[in-house]
């Protein structure tokens, strides 16, 4: 597997199969003294990893927090089984939280297989307006798998939050009814101690504007850039509000 980024938060550590040495980006933390900074970094690095896995122009994010497992999206339909195989290589047997940012195939492509292959404790996605509900088999297979496995499923709404021990995940969007599937994307802010991430799915500029208008604190350390870096996302105002130290784009050759 080519891993776009494995952020092991002791700084931020990115590595891939072609460059096993990787490189370390320091100073992700702000602390009042070097000793506090060093201790905080050590504690967080032992607790939290965020894997941005290269699945082409699609999204698959695996989060390891202590002994808990979280996934956000599940790639496209191909390459076959890339998501389940990757999770098995990480010794995952149970998924505490599975998230679908929105129902496009390049985000839900292998979610049905994940649900069938692992014990999924909780599943969340956003509400899809009736006019935008997908009619393809991929979406139907995911819903069928959720029903067959009796997964605790929930429509997540802006303003809600989920906590796993002292890891907090806040739902910032969608704030309003999206006019297209991209603007139904769940936008999630994940915070652990003094480190934060923003996961944006394929949220476009309209949803970004709604989130800004809602008054959320968008400042984070790491941004998962919306819609694979497309010009339809990442408005200048949004990027100023987020002001990340690092950004990750999931993209493949066109």
Feature locations, PLM:
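Non-globular, low-confidence helical/coil segments that flank catalytic cores
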Residues: 1-254
């Amino acid at each position: 597997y080519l891993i776009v980024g494995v952020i092991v938060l002791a700084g931020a550590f990115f590595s891939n199969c072609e460059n096993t040495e990787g490189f370390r980006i320091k100073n992700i933390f702000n602390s009042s003294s070097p000793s506090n900074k060093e201790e905080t970094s050590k504690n967080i690095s032992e607790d939290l990893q965020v894997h941005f896995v290269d699945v082409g122009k699609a999204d698959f994010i695996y989060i390891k927090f202590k002994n808990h497992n979280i996934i956000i999206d599940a790639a496209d339909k191909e390459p076959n089984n890339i998501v389940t195989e990757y999770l098995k290589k990480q010794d995952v047997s149970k998924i505490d939280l599975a998230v679908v940012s929105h129902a496009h195939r390049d985000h839900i492509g292998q979610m049905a297989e994940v649900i069938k292959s692992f014990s999924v404790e909780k599943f969340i996605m956003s509400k899809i307006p009736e006019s935008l509900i997908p009619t393809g088999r991929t979406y139907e297979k995911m819903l069928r798998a959720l029903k067959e496995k009796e997964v605790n499923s929930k429509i997540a709404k802006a303003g809600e939050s989920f906590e796993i021990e002292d890891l907090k995940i806040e739902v910032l969007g969608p704030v309003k009814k999206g006019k297209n599937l991209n603007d139904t994307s769940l936008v999630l802010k994940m915070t652990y101690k003094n480190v934060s991430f923003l996961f944006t799915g394929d949220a476009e500029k309209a949803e970004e504007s709604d989130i800004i208008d809602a008054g959320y604190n968008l400042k984070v350390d790491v941004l998962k850039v919306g819609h694979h870096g497309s010009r339809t996302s990442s408005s200048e105002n949004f990027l100023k509000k987020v002001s990340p130290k690092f950004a990750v784009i999931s993209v493949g050759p066109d």
